[in-house]
Amino acid sequence: MKIRETIIDFATLPAQQKHDFFQQMLEFDQLIFPFASVEQLYQYVHDPEAVSVPVIQYFVGEQLIGQNIMPILKLQLQDKPIFVVTSRAGVLEQYRRSNLTLKTAIRVALRYRLRYPAIPLWFVTTLMQPKVYTLFASRSRYFYPRKGYTMPTAYQSVLELMHRYKSQVDKRGQGIYVAPALMPKVTPDQLIRLRKRSDVHYQFFMQHVPDYFDGKGLMCVCRLDFKTISETIMNLAFGKSVH
């Protein structure tokens, strides 16, 4: 099974192409996030702070089987510019066994890091499944929050800056913020199976977000510097996990 990927910067498309491509994105997005509104996706890809909106799509033959929308926002933190990458990703269930979206997202981040080396690049996401949190936390020691480590001040400042994009943020500890998250299409049995793990990252997530069943997610942050990117690439390549 050969998976083909395409990357299109939604922000650079002419108006008519934007309209047509948005309809394609929306159709697939609703397969993954059936409870999300059209307005949510529209605002996400038309964020006025976005300098680029890479959209990575994955195909098997002509069938679209996965999608990752990654707006890159240019914001100000303490009067200095920073870039913040967010992600809205989904893959059809039968293709979820590989780190498909993570691998390509790293490549996109690396290109942007090389293009603008003087401006810090951050990744901020709200994760509502312990399995997905574990995927990220187990690949880099610099993905926060995490068990046994205090979140650095700079990381917390970026996380707090992104509160503006959430309707409600609940602080549940030092550096622990829980907010509404996109609910993917899953069955109750699938959600229950996500809990049957003893991994340290699973336990940490469940300790702080036991109500993820209700659409709550853990706000997470990672600085995408060369140290973090290279560590993640190596851990993915060799199947290594970190605690």
What residue spans do the PLM features occupy?
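Terminal substrate-recognition subdomain of acyl/acetyltransferases
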Residues: 1-22, 26, 30-32, 41-57, ...
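Conserved beta-strand in the GNAT
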Residues: 53, 57, 62-74, 85
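A short, polar/charged loop-to-alpha-helix boundary motif
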Residues: 75-81
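Structural motif
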Residues: 83-85, 122
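A short, internal acetyl-CoA/4′-phosphopantetheine-binding micro-motif in the GNAT/acyltransferase core
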Residues: 88-97
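Internal, hydrophobic cores of structured domains that mediate oligomerization or house catalytic pockets
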Residues: 89, 109-110, 116
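Conserved acetyl-CoA-binding loop-helix of GNAT-fold acetyltransferases
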Residues: 96-111
